[in-house]
């Protein structure tokens, strides 16, 4: 189980060399969060990694709040594309 970083960046980039826009960062965090969620279904007592998961969720929330404040239309498109609730 690993993340295909290049395809995630390719699907969410805003320009040709974009790797750091909020959309890309949120998409990468979402992929890592989904991967860790599957991990916790098997390893229920892995509390050390659970802390990292919570940090990722909080980081994603911050980036989404920023994007919502800066450009609401991009925010709505990203939420719909990634299938996130809000």
Swiss-Prot record:
One of its GO terms (biological process) is translation. The keyword S-adenosyl-L-methionine does not apply. Keywords: Ribonucleoprotein, Ribosomal protein, RNA-binding, rRNA-binding. Residues 1-21 are annotated as: Disordered. One of its GO terms (molecular function) is rRNA binding. Residues 1-10 have a biased composition (Polar residues). CDD domains: Ribosomal_S15p_S13e. Coiled coil: none annotated. It comes from the Bacteria. GO terms for cellular component: cytosolic small ribosomal subunit. InterPro entries: Ribosomal_uS15, Ribosomal_uS15_bac-type, uS15_NS1_RNA-bd_sf. The keyword Oxidoreductase does not apply. Belongs to the universal ribosomal protein uS15 family. NCBIfam families: S15_bact (TIGR00952). One of the primary rRNA binding proteins, it binds directly to 16S rRNA where it helps nucleate assembly of the platform of the 30S subunit by binding and bridging several RNA helices of the 16S rRNA. Forms an intersubunit bridge (bridge B4) with the 23S rRNA of the 50S subunit in the ribosome. Part of the 30S ribosomal subunit. Forms a bridge to the 50S subunit in the 70S ribosome, contacting the 23S rRNA. This is Small ribosomal subunit protein uS15. It comes from Xylella fastidiosa (strain M12).
